[in-house]
Amino acid sequence: MAYVDTNTLISYYFDEEKLHEISVRIFNVLRAMRKKIYISSLTLVELYSAIARNLSRYRLPPHYMVLDEERKIHALVKDILEHLKPILVDDEPKLELFDKSSVFHIYKKTINYVATLKLRSLDLLHITYAIEFAKRGLVDMFVTLDKELINRKQVLESLGLKVMDFS
């Protein structure tokens, strides 16, 4: 069971991505290991965002040409999800107290990793989701193409998250 971040999904699906070949190798290994793929709601938001920002550079099949931009984006995300069949894990709509305010549980957990990991906020959120999914027995590894995350492999593994490294 593997938590796969957005850049790996995008790189796999689109031939134009510079890390396409590596991501194909990653998914071949995951299939050979019979690993289920897990994603978070953050991954879903990032998929939409990444496709919207890069839509003009992707070579799309002819049947996409009749769609307006918004429908193309939705269709591509749907196609990625249908093709890779990741399991989207529900968010816990739990609130926690933080400095006299209520914040979502996942954000509070993320704040706890800030000093240790020193990553960008979305990367921190992905890591937190993966750690939380691991605690629930859903995943046992984190898959990324992000060098900054791979460079923190030892720290992540000390937090209980095995990192798949294909660099």
Regions found by a protein language model. Name each.
Residues 8, 43, 126, 148-149:
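Alpha-helix capping/helix-boundary segments
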Residues 1-72, 165-167:
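Short, well-structured N-terminal submotif of metal-dependent ribonuclease cores
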Residues 4, 38-39, 121-124, 144:
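Short beta-strand scaffold positions
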